[in-house]
């Protein structure tokens, strides 16, 4: 019998992965004090995340009826965001522009997909490589974003909102290219909805995400102003 959504395997995975992620972040916060230690922590974390997402792409390419090498290229928002985030942290500097595009996608996509894992039933085994690696790369991506925020490696601000527009444009352009060149009917939910039976294609989700992102940025600015007033009053 295939693993079920919120079945025993899924619930155990969520409990264990949440516990491990929390412990890792607490230990890192306790022991990583210098800039060098923080840098090493993030490079190692990003390298691990990169290995898992690349392994996930190989699993997608090899485990469904033979080699489909074009599947090495991520064709979904979550997979591409996991790859881009890992590379941005591994190769980029603190607060680099790419992070401002992927941080919210990585956090929301990682958490929501790990919880609402609709792909669990694709094989009788919970440890079927595409299943377990898919769960792991979503979890690692979400945890990496939390770590970036926790260690102040990204300064979330409305002043860099345009990187999100540029990033979405790149995703959709790549998706359209893949649909034309490779034997696939959809990429990045351009043609097919995220949830079957709904209207949640990219053309609907992009405006929804833009509104949600704007609200998050507004909330961040309000928090910053409140903290600044508190600091001013204390002085």
Question: Positions of the model-derived regions?
Answer:
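N-terminal topogenic module of multi-pass integral membrane proteins
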Residues: 1-44, 49-55
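Membrane-interface transmembrane-helix boundary segments in multi-pass integral membrane proteins
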Residues: 2-16, 159-170, 178-218
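Hydrophobic cores of alpha-helical transmembrane segments in multi-pass inner/ER membrane proteins
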Residues: 14-25, 78-90, 137-151, 205-221
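Membrane-interface helix-boundary motifs at transmembrane edges
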Residues: 30-42, 90-99, 151-162, 226
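Hydrophobic residues within the alpha-helical transmembrane core of Major Facilitator Superfamily
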Residues: 54-55, 83, 111
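Juxtamembrane "helix-exit" motif on the non-cytosolic side of transmembrane helices
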Residues: 55-65, 115-125, 181
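Non-cytosolic membrane-interface motifs at loop->transmembrane helix junctions
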Residues: 65-77, 124-134
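Membrane-proximal helix-loop-helix units in multi-pass membrane proteins
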Residues: 87-151
């Amino acid at each position: 019998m295939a693993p079920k959504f919120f079945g025993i395997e899924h619930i155990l995975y969520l409990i264990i992965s949440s516990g491990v992620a929390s412990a890792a972040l607490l230990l890192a916060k306790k022991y990583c004090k210098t800039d060098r230690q923080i840098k090493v922590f993030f490079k190692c974390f990003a390298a691990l995340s990169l290995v898992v997402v690349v392994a996930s792409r190989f699993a997608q390419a090899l485990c469904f009826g033979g080699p489909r090498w074009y599947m090495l290229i991520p064709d979904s928002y979550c997979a591409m965001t996991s790859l881009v985030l890992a590379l941005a942290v591994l190769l980029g500097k603190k607060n680099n522009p790419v992070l401002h595009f992927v941080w919210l996608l990585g956090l929301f996509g990682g958490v929501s997909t790990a919880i609402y894992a609709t792909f669990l039933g694709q094989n009788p085994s919970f440890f079927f490589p595409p299943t377990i690696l898919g769960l792991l790369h979503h979890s690692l991506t979400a945890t990496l974003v939390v770590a970036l925020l926790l260690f102040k490696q990204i300064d979330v601000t409305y002043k860099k909102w345009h990187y999100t527009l540029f990033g979405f444009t790149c995703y959709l352009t790549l998706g359209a290219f893949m649909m034309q060149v490779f034997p696939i009917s959809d990429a990045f939910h351009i043609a097919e909805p995220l949830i079957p039976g709904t209207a949640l294609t990219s053309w609907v989700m992009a405006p929804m995400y833009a509104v949600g992102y704007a609200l998050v940025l507004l909330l961040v600015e309000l928090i910053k102003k409140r903290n600044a007033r508190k600091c001013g009053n204390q002085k």
